[in-house]
Structures are given as C-alpha cells and as structure tokens.
Amino acid sequence: MSIVNSIRAQIPPVHPEGYPFIGGFALVTLLFFWLWSPLGWIALVLTIWCALFFRNPVRVTPVRDDLVVSPADGRISMVTPVVPPAELGLGDKPLLRISIFMSVFNCHVNRAPVGGRIEKIVYTPGKFINAELDKASEDNERNAMVISTPSGQIGVVQIAGLIARRIVSFVRVGQTLATGERFGLIRFGSRLDVFLPEGSKALVSVGQTAIAGETVLADFRQGDGGRTYRAD
C-alpha cells in the first residue's frame, strides 16, 4: 500500500450534510487569503474543523439481540431514572435515561442504539439552552423516536443545544433499523437521550466516553454469548 493510500485510509469520509458548510468555509478561506493571509490561515483551520465535525467514520458495531449501543459520540452526562417525555408515549413511570453530551469536537452522526422498527417520530420546537442542563430535555428543540424491539420499546431523543440549531433525521416511521445504523445528526453540539425499558441496568457511568455504534450502554441478557460484530 502506498503512503498516499495509507494516509487516505486514516481520514474518515465526510457526511453529505456537511458539504454546503465545508464549501462555504472554503470560499471564505480563499477570500481571506486574497484580502490578508493571516485571516486566511485562521479560516483554513476553521474549514478543517468543519470537515472534522461532519466526519462519518466506519464503526464496528456489536450485533446481538438485547444489546443497546451508544447513539452518539461524546461523554455520558447523566444516568438516572426519569419520566420520559410525553411525546414518546412510554408512560408516566420513571425509566432509565442515559444521556450523551456531544461537544463541537465530537462526530455528530447519530446511530440507532438497537435494531428494530420505528414506531413513532415526533419533532418538538423549543428553546436552545445548554444541552447539558437537565431541563433541556423538556425546554429545547428536540426530535423523539420510539424503536420497537423484542425486549421492549426504546426511546431516543435528539436534543438541540446552545450552538446546535438544526436536527436532521434520515429515517421515517415504519422503517426497520439495524443496530448502529445511521439515523440522523445534530449540527454543532448537542445531546442524545436513550430511554430504556423498566428494569434495565446501565453498563456505563457518568463521565465515561462513548463511541456511537460501539460502546454498549446496556445488555438485557445475562452473559455475553452469541455476540458478533458488523462494520458500517
């Protein structure tokens, strides 16, 4: 393998959602270089950052019924039982919620935490307060999805934040997702909440780093037998 191919293999592809933003940054960079080169170098750094933000890397997902993987890259910010948002239709009893906060430096492509059928998608307009705050789950703009699995229904909520002002969904009601399949993204910093069925136990802790499609958040089955992996 040539050096060029080796370098290329280490650079993740960019998601098409990022093309307009990267193109805009690139044009501004050229303009700034023409006006004053120091500004051009600053703009070039921002262009590279934008490309990294929209990176769309291949992930190796553990595949087995009853596994729940992280839907987002980021930091586990909350692991606590709370009453799920009404729009999910998951009842009024507290369910285990695992929240993943994505900074502007994380990959923001979101992946299905479980394989199953999408029963519901509900978009709710709202505010843009700090996504790390607990009340952001009620006050902020969000897109909620319910996935039906043999182990029960899983709620997934994309929550916009201070900088994130655009939630993008690639899926529709009735569609069947595979574990780790890409289903959307949130631009420029945000949060993902996963609501697990009653009786679930988390396998992650607050402060832990999560990798979308790879980090196992919960396992409804005792033991670890029968797990396989899929790259996507």
Swiss-Prot record:
Classify the protein's membrane topology as the record does.
Peripheral membrane protein
Q: What GO biological process term is on the record, naming one?
A: phosphatidylethanolamine biosynthetic process
Enzyme class per UniProt: lyase
Where is this chain primarily localised? membrane
Q: Which reaction does it catalyse?
A: a 1,2-diacyl-sn-glycero-3-phospho-L-serine + H(+) = a 1,2-diacyl-sn-glycero-3-phosphoethanolamine + CO2
User: Known post-translational modifications?
Assistant: Is synthesized initially as an inactive proenzyme. Formation of the active enzyme involves a self-maturation process in which the active site pyruvoyl group is generated from an internal serine residue via an autocatalytic post-translational modification. Two non-identical subunits are generated from the proenzyme in this reaction, and the pyruvate is formed at the N-terminus of the alpha chain, which is derived from the carboxyl end of the proenzyme.
Q: What is its EC number?
A: 4.1.1.65
Q: Name one GO cellular component term.
A: plasma membrane
Q: Please give one Pfam family short name.
A: PS_Dcarbxylase
Q: Which InterPro entries match?
A: PS_Dcarbxylase, PSD-A
Keyword terms, alphabetized: Cell membrane, Decarboxylase, Lipid biosynthesis, Lipid metabolism, Lyase, Membrane, Phospholipid biosynthesis, Phospholipid metabolism, Pyruvate, Zymogen
Cofactor(s) listed: pyruvate
UniProt site positions, description: Cleavage (non-hydrolytic): 189-190
**Subcellular location(s) of the protein:** Cell membrane
Q: What does this protein do?
A: Catalyzes the formation of phosphatidylethanolamine (PtdEtn) from phosphatidylserine (PtdSer).
Q: Which NCBIfam families match?
A: PRK05305.1-1, PRK05305.1-2, PRK05305.1-3, PRK05305.2-5
Summarize subunit and interaction data from the UniProt record for this chain: Heterodimer of a large membrane-associated beta subunit and a small pyruvoyl-containing alpha subunit.
- Name under which the protein is recorded: Phosphatidylserine decarboxylase proenzyme
According to its UniProt entry, this protein's organism is Rhodopseudomonas palustris (strain BisA53)
